[in-house]
Structure formats: structure tokens, C-alpha cells
Amino acid sequence: MTVKTQLNYQVYNWEGQVSGNADLNLKISKDSGMYLVHRALVKQSNEKRQGSANTKTRSEVRGGGRKPWRQKGTGRARAGSIRSPLWRGGGVIFGPKPRSFAKKMNKKESQLALRTALNNKSVNTLVVENFDTYFQKPKTKLFIEAITRWNLDLNKKLLVIVDKKDLNVYLSIRNLYNVEIISADTLNIMALLAAHKVIITVDALSKIQEVYNG
């Protein structure tokens, strides 16, 4: 079941002062929200797994075609192959094989989970005016000063969501250990949940409204 909700934000300028207001209208999941968000997180986590772990069974290990010794009369336990899983250098029983860990999730479900997570993060979200014009060249110090003016803590994980990646902004931010920058159309559940605070530009907020509110 989905319900419509409107999130109201104060918009801060580059100097850290309130310059206006912005709204974000979302259709979010009411009853099963946490379940959907969890499924989306598991799906994205699984997609990062290579699934390439591989072991050889006794039939795949090279050699071992000849019986080591005759069946009876030696006093030793019977053996049919030196590649038995009981032997050193033998095959592996029930070992891992290459496989896909991917989980299916419908596009509407995925977007609903993302909107629900955005709603849950609204308390820790800061909307700011577009600031790409302030970066005529890459300069990390400029962004650190802005973070201070916005009363944010660089010791905690920050997610910066912009309309589109500006090269100078990206190069200025990427050197900061606790700050991740992504464009609105590549917003994902893992980045959103991992962040302690979320910074969204005004244009990115409009893009989120347009792209994910289907």
C-alpha cells in the first residue's frame, strides 16, 4: 500500500543562510516499507558479489584414474582413487561453484523502496542551492568551508546528491574520506542508507521528483 507524502525543506545558500523553501512529493510504502528497503539493500549487495569461487570435485582433479592398490590382501583400507576427498590433494565435497547471487526486484518495487528510504532520511537531509559555479577549478578547501557553514560534521558519512556531476566539484570532493558524491539519476539504496547526513541540491531534488516518482 502506498501513501502520498510531501516533504518540506528549507533551502540553504552557499553562505549557510536560509534562502527559501523546497518541496518533494513522494509516494511511499506505508505498511511494508522496511521489508521493501531491506530487499532492495540485499539485491544491491548481492550484485556486488563476484560469485566466482570455484573448487574441483574428485572427477575434475587431474590424475587418480588408477586404483592405488588392489582391493584385498594389503591390510590397508580399500581405496579407489588418489583423488578421493579423503586424501590430501583430492577433490572437494560440496565446495563452492561459480554462481550468480543476483535477486530479482521489479522496477516499481525498487523505486518505491528508494522513495521510502528518502522519506526516512528526510530528518537528516539538507537541501542547498546549486554550488557548481563556485568551483572554477578543483579545490577541496572550498567544500570543507561550506560544510562548516552548513553545520555538518566531516567525521560522519555524508552523501552529496547533485543534478549532474561537474568535474571540478567531483575532483574537489573525492579526496574527502567520509564524503560520497553521486548524481540524482544514479541514486541507490546502499549509498542512501550508509550516509549519516544527505546533502541535495535544488536541481537534484527536482530530478529525484521526476525520475523516481513513477
Curated annotation (Swiss-Prot):
Record's keyword annotation contains Magnesium: no
Cellular-component GO terms for this entry: chloroplast; ribonucleoprotein complex; ribosome
GO MF entries: rRNA binding; structural constituent of ribosome
Compartment(s): Plastid, Chloroplast
Gene3D superfamilies named in the record: 3.40.1370.10
Keyword Glycosyltransferase: no
Spans traversing the lipid bilayer: none
Recorded superkingdom: Eukaryota
InterPro entries linked to this entry: Ribosomal_uL4, Ribosomal_uL4-like, Ribosomal_uL4_dom_sf
Keywords: Chloroplast, Plastid, Ribonucleoprotein, Ribosomal protein, RNA-binding, rRNA-binding
Annotated spans, Disordered: 43-80
Biological process terms in GO annotation: translation
Pfam family, one: Ribosomal_L4
Biased composition (Basic residues): 64-75
Primary localization: plastid
Assembly mode: Part of the 50S ribosomal subunit.
UniProt record similarity statement: Belongs to the universal ribosomal protein uL4 family.
Function: Probably binds the 23S rRNA.
Protein name, per record: Large ribosomal subunit protein uL4c
Gene: rpl4
